[in-house]
Amino acid sequence: MTTKLSESEIQSALRERSAWTVVNGKLHREYKFADFIHAFGFMTCAALSAEAMNHHPEWFNVYNRLTIDLTTHDAGGITAKDFQLAAKLDALAAG
């Protein structure tokens, strides 16, 4: 099991993921794509990465917008695994 990060560890890790914030105890980001096809394509690629990590996002999609929340339920909060997935998602979004 992974260990929940402290508040100072989270703040330090957020410096490398500036587009992410913490909302309601979860790592949070909103993406905007050109259209629904691009948003859904990203979600498909993201799902493959998440499945490979066995770490699945909470997400909500409307047209070209995608909201993602990451947390590690077993640890009861944000862990390094959430930041690892956030980095993969950012790399996918960057193309």
UniProtKB/Swiss-Prot annotation:
InterPro entries: PCD_sf, Pterin_deHydtase
Molecular function per GO: 4-alpha-hydroxytetrahydrobiopterin dehydratase activity
PANTHER family: PTERIN-4-ALPHA-CARBINOLAMINE DEHYDRATASE
Single GO biological process annotation from the record: tetrahydrobiopterin biosynthetic process
Catalysed reactions, as listed in the record: (4aS,6R)-4a-hydroxy-L-erythro-5,6,7,8-tetrahydrobiopterin = (6R)-L-erythro-6,7-dihydrobiopterin + H2O
Similarity remark: Belongs to the pterin-4-alpha-carbinolamine dehydratase family.
Protein's name according to its UniProt entry: Putative pterin-4-alpha-carbinolamine dehydratase
Species: Solibacter usitatus (strain Ellin6076)
EC top class named in words: lyase
Record-listed E.C. numbers: 4.2.1.96
Listed Pfam families: Pterin_4a
Keywords carried by this UniProt record: Lyase
